[in-house]
Amino acid sequence: MAFTSKLKVRFADIDWARVVYFARFFDFAHRTFEDFFNEHAKLPYAAVLADRKVGFPIVSSTAEFFVPLRLGDTARVQMEVLKLSKRSVTSRFTLYKDETDERCAVIVLKQAAIDTSTFTGTELPDDIHALLSAHLVAA
Protein backbone atom coordinates (compact mmCIF):
# COMPACT_ATOMS: atom_id res chain seq x y z
CA MET A 1 0.00 0.00 0.00
CA ALA A 2 1.46 3.34 -1.05
CA PHE A 3 1.43 6.50 1.04
CA THR A 4 0.73 9.57 -1.11
CA SER A 5 1.70 13.19 -0.56
CA LYS A 6 1.04 16.22 -2.77
CA LEU A 7 3.58 19.03 -3.07
CA LYS A 8 3.19 22.27 -5.00
CA VAL A 9 6.18 23.22 -7.17
CA ARG A 10 7.42 26.60 -5.96
CA PHE A 11 9.80 29.18 -7.42
CA ALA A 12 12.66 27.93 -5.22
CA ASP A 13 12.30 24.45 -6.76
CA ILE A 14 13.04 25.44 -10.36
CA ASP A 15 16.29 26.12 -12.20
CA TRP A 16 17.28 28.45 -15.04
CA ALA A 17 15.51 26.15 -17.52
CA ARG A 18 12.27 26.79 -15.57
CA VAL A 19 11.85 23.14 -14.59
CA VAL A 20 12.34 21.48 -11.22
CA TYR A 21 16.06 21.20 -10.51
CA PHE A 22 17.00 17.51 -10.32
CA ALA A 23 18.18 17.64 -6.70
CA ARG A 24 14.77 18.94 -5.61
CA PHE A 25 13.25 15.58 -6.56
CA PHE A 26 15.28 14.09 -3.70
CA ASP A 27 13.90 16.81 -1.44
CA PHE A 28 10.36 15.95 -2.56
CA ALA A 29 11.05 12.30 -1.73
CA HIS A 30 12.35 13.15 1.73
CA ARG A 31 9.47 15.54 2.42
CA THR A 32 7.11 12.67 1.58
CA PHE A 33 9.04 10.42 3.99
CA GLU A 34 8.55 13.09 6.68
CA ASP A 35 4.86 13.45 5.76
CA PHE A 36 4.48 9.68 6.15
CA PHE A 37 5.36 10.09 9.83
CA ASN A 38 3.62 13.43 10.40
CA GLU A 39 0.33 12.75 8.61
CA HIS A 40 -0.10 9.01 8.23
CA ALA A 41 1.57 7.68 11.37
CA LYS A 42 0.63 10.69 13.54
CA LEU A 43 4.19 10.52 14.85
CA PRO A 44 5.89 13.88 14.29
CA TYR A 45 9.13 13.39 12.36
CA ALA A 46 10.80 16.03 14.53
CA ALA A 47 9.95 13.92 17.59
CA VAL A 48 11.34 10.79 15.93
CA LEU A 49 14.66 12.61 15.48
CA ALA A 50 14.80 14.57 18.74
CA ASP A 51 12.83 12.57 21.31
CA ARG A 52 13.05 9.03 19.95
CA LYS A 53 16.62 9.71 18.79
CA VAL A 54 16.20 7.78 15.54
CA GLY A 55 17.56 9.21 12.30
CA PHE A 56 17.44 7.98 8.71
CA PRO A 57 20.50 9.08 6.71
CA ILE A 58 20.55 8.06 3.07
CA VAL A 59 23.20 5.43 2.34
CA SER A 60 22.24 4.70 -1.27
CA SER A 61 20.10 6.44 -3.89
CA THR A 62 19.04 6.06 -7.50
CA ALA A 63 16.96 8.30 -9.72
CA GLU A 64 15.28 8.11 -13.11
CA PHE A 65 13.71 11.18 -14.69
CA PHE A 66 11.00 11.08 -17.36
CA VAL A 67 8.89 14.26 -17.59
CA PRO A 68 9.76 17.68 -16.14
CA LEU A 69 7.76 19.43 -13.47
CA ARG A 70 7.29 23.19 -13.78
CA LEU A 71 6.43 26.11 -11.53
CA GLY A 72 2.83 25.80 -10.35
CA ASP A 73 2.54 22.06 -11.02
CA THR A 74 1.51 19.73 -8.22
CA ALA A 75 3.78 16.75 -7.64
CA ARG A 76 1.95 13.67 -6.41
CA VAL A 77 4.49 11.49 -4.64
CA GLN A 78 3.76 7.86 -3.86
CA MET A 79 5.99 6.19 -1.27
CA GLU A 80 6.30 2.40 -1.15
CA VAL A 81 8.62 0.36 1.07
CA LEU A 82 10.58 -2.07 -1.10
CA LYS A 83 12.78 -3.66 1.56
CA LEU A 84 12.81 -3.51 5.33
CA SER A 85 15.28 -4.91 7.83
CA LYS A 86 15.84 -4.29 11.51
CA ARG A 87 18.41 -1.59 10.65
CA SER A 88 17.36 -0.02 7.34
CA VAL A 89 14.51 0.77 4.96
CA THR A 90 14.56 1.01 1.17
CA SER A 91 11.71 3.07 -0.27
CA ARG A 92 10.59 3.94 -3.79
CA PHE A 93 9.15 7.39 -4.42
CA THR A 94 7.27 7.71 -7.71
CA LEU A 95 6.53 11.30 -8.65
CA TYR A 96 3.65 12.19 -10.94
CA LYS A 97 2.45 15.48 -12.37
CA ASP A 98 -0.90 15.46 -10.58
CA GLU A 99 -2.67 17.49 -13.24
CA THR A 100 -1.94 14.99 -16.05
CA ASP A 101 -0.97 11.80 -14.19
CA GLU A 102 2.34 11.70 -16.11
CA ARG A 103 5.16 9.87 -14.35
CA CYS A 104 7.98 12.36 -13.82
CA ALA A 105 10.59 10.52 -11.78
CA VAL A 106 11.33 7.47 -9.68
CA ILE A 107 13.65 7.86 -6.70
CA VAL A 108 14.83 4.88 -4.64
CA LEU A 109 16.40 5.62 -1.26
CA LYS A 110 18.03 3.23 1.19
CA GLN A 111 18.12 4.78 4.64
CA ALA A 112 19.95 3.35 7.63
CA ALA A 113 18.61 3.68 11.16
CA ILE A 114 20.94 5.58 13.46
CA ASP A 115 20.92 6.75 17.06
CA THR A 116 20.95 10.54 16.65
CA SER A 117 22.77 11.06 19.95
CA THR A 118 25.77 8.96 18.87
CA PHE A 119 25.40 8.80 15.07
CA THR A 120 25.91 5.05 15.17
CA GLY A 121 23.77 2.39 13.58
CA THR A 122 20.83 1.09 15.57
CA GLU A 123 17.77 -1.10 15.17
CA LEU A 124 14.47 0.43 14.21
CA PRO A 125 12.09 0.69 17.17
CA ASP A 126 9.35 -1.95 16.92
CA ASP A 127 6.54 0.57 16.34
CA ILE A 128 8.39 2.34 13.52
CA HIS A 129 9.32 -1.00 11.97
CA ALA A 130 5.62 -1.99 12.09
CA LEU A 131 4.53 1.32 10.47
CA LEU A 132 6.96 0.86 7.62
CA SER A 133 6.14 -2.84 7.30
CA ALA A 134 2.49 -1.99 6.61
CA HIS A 135 3.68 -0.28 3.38
CA LEU A 136 5.96 -3.08 2.20
CA VAL A 137 5.15 -4.03 -1.40
CA ALA A 138 5.48 -7.50 -2.88
CA ALA A 139 8.71 -8.00 -4.81
Describe each PLM feature range:
Residues 6-10, 64, 110:
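Generic structural detector for well-ordered beta-strands
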